[in-house]
């Protein structure tokens, strides 16, 4: 057998990409091992790529993980974090029993953490909730959850909070990372989530990355892009960012733009398409309609902030007005090549190269983006703008062409968005503000009419403000670390958590920054210590079975939610008007109403699977996960969100919804791929009754905060390959911690020299909100342009979010972690 040039190039591309991302090459014969290790599948615990791994267990512990060679997503590859998954659960400081702040044998806000039983923990939680509900509205009781929560857990949370306690104040940390993408999907297409799939990578001839360092944040997908680029000379890669990172190593067109100027660049591309007669009129006329967005909409700041007070249309930020092509043309017309260059600082030849790629009808192209796009005070707009250029050219919903929003968490799509753990959402793209949607959910859950409030609760940043202001008095945080990951910690988060009027609960496997700031810590099971399901960025739903038990008294979030529901009777949390509709519910617990309701509890636990463990099923006496999933999945079936039956997912490496007649959907809205598109329609954006997507005209507007004479640099925050989010898991893996032990500040050498600083110096980063001390890096992997510094938030010893501004997109409520003003001095 000969190895031809193409095979050689492909092999080298895969190896090079693997090496760059610290990946392991798959071992095919793991099942054949005779060392007593039992192997089973599970999706990776980290990012939203959705890699499948093989988990090896022995003597009740996870002892090894490998890339799953049978998985289509990662094809046996692991990134460096995935390689060390077996160690994330075994940090020496696992929390193994509930811990309550106590003094003199009673709860005290300033007391020491003292071990208590689960019954004691739930009793004081229930007392606090009931007391608040007697005095205040239900939205005064809140939950802050996560895009790492399993589908089963997320659904159980939504049922308890919205259907039981009648509070819509439940939001995920996905509000910080994916809310703008989700809102723009809903506004543009009438439905959430990408239309394409990862197969686009092998089908396209061009990749444009907007604010996405895929080489470090989605390394397995980057390995596939690298393979595609290095094995075909015609394939081109454009990488766009406010600083140079590892993804630039593969870029044919590397573009550094000024913070916030992506708005101007995208409007220039739209203008270029129009001025050069490259509009796909057949597609536009058949499949789109035009709208104009509200302008001068503010920055999601507190109402008394000067920038917020000056905004004319903050109260109508999300409004869209009927429009037409001519008005859209006028909106983008000012964004000439010269204007885009002036605003962005990007050389004109690079801007033209980019515009021509989008405009060329023969050029297949996929746009990828993540937090650089979404964490933006105009994040919804900029998402709309990238849809605009794909819709104007018809480069959408077809193999190798489309806009693709990548998620940063393993189930930001599957749980936060699809299940609906946001303050305004319900399952399957339904919302609490739509009375018809509420009626559908109440009927399915067998609840009295009017149980679910039709007013959204407090979203993520607003939760912190309301805790501080005393309007939100109970918060249960699960599977996230907002005291480290949220913005403006000193001014807006910490004060509310330590407000003596409030009671804060944190479910966490480790003593995170959030946990040690709470009043009660609940020990939670991790990853394969429970049965679970995730939904990744390409709409792929994946299941796994429990493979080991959690340590000590650790319990899964699912067990915690469902067990906690037993501590409430309907008479204690529902008013007489609701009880009068269904008197049979009087005296019943929320557990009986929501979970042991004849639907969730109707499936028996499997008895024919060797070595099967399911702690929740054993405790509650039925197959809780299956009951929750089948009740939840019924909302989407027949409505474009079809999921397969529960048992199927345990047999496969995931399926991309909608799954109809056992067949997954690769490209939505396109005839021949999507079962909801009728013969002869070609394309159908069926999320709207008229089956047309929206092209939205909006302008460039200034950021919330910019450098000035005192705070003379831009601050951008983000991550590194070795660590994930706040490092709660990865910093407890010795190999990952040693590889990148502490946060750094990356700066241009000339900026350092101008301040009398050198590489390695200890420096102080100072904003209007706070300061941290770190070390300077002028030579490392991230190369900043003059005027901008970059730092990360994984290091609990350097709380970078003391610095960040709590400005949000006014439409989505998503935080802008990428842009605020900072100064750097020697420490």
From Swiss-Prot:
Identify the residues that bind Mo-bis(molybdopterin guanine dinucleotide): 81, 148, 173, 177, 210-217, 241-245, 371, 375, 481, 507-508, 530, 557, 717-726, 801, 818
| Catalytic reactions of this protein | 2 Fe(II)-[cytochrome] + nitrate + 2 H(+) = 2 Fe(III)-[cytochrome] + nitrite + H2O
Q: Which cofactor names does the annotation list?
A: [4Fe-4S] cluster; Mo-bis(molybdopterin guanine dinucleotide)
- Give Gene Ontology CC terms: membrane; nitrate reductase complex; periplasmic space
Start and end residues of each 4Fe-4S Mo/W bis-MGD-type domain = 37-93
Is-annotated flag, keyword Iron-sulfur? yes
Binding of [4Fe-4S] cluster, residues: 44, 47, 51, 79
One Pfam family per UniProt = Molybdopterin
Listed A to Z, the keywords are:
4Fe-4S, Electron transport, Iron, Iron-sulfur, Metal-binding, Molybdenum, Nitrate assimilation, Oxidoreductase, Periplasm, Signal, Transport
Kindly state a single biological-process term from the GO annotations of this entry. cellular respiration
Post-translational modification, briefly?
Predicted to be exported by the Tat system. The position of the signal peptide cleavage has not been experimentally proven.
HAMAP family xref list: Nitrate_reduct_NapA
Family the entry assigns: Belongs to the prokaryotic molybdopterin-containing oxidoreductase family. NasA/NapA/NarB subfamily.
Please state what the protein is called: Periplasmic nitrate reductase
